[in-house]
């Protein structure tokens, strides 16, 4: 199945944008990949971490288009990204840097969703949220402390949580950093995502609310399965 999509990524009230998003489409192989990474502001070079992980996942995906099932590719892409981050952090001297990640790959009529941290994916169908990733965050320390992520000093914490679903034409998939969903009530976000207006207009409304209420970078990918 193919997708129709739109993306956005803004620094918001922060000085720099440490979020990254990418979309890859391979129409001849009937698959696509969407990735959002949110560099961790509590560590140095969060933007570099997000860029490194996102690029490594996309490069692995492009190099393995014809091989392996989607779940295996997702897991191995995350391993490649973790290795890339480890190597990047040691170019001069060991540097602490990390990023969250959420990705969704669609092959034929199956979507494989993986995430580490508090970046989210929503799968919506017929006015309902069919699936939403659960944040990897420590409830004792609040939502600001993630328990699973890509971290240069500890590659083991980058084990992704993976889920698979059948998708249908008309399904909507939304990937975003926490700067989006923390800017509005959950019911408002999901209502906006299901608006029948053109995707660009739907995203414009979400961006407007983020501009007003988000205190972080905000990034998202909204796609419709066709």
Indicate where each model-derived feature is located:
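PP2C/PPM-type serine/threonine phosphatase catalytic domain
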Residues: 1-226
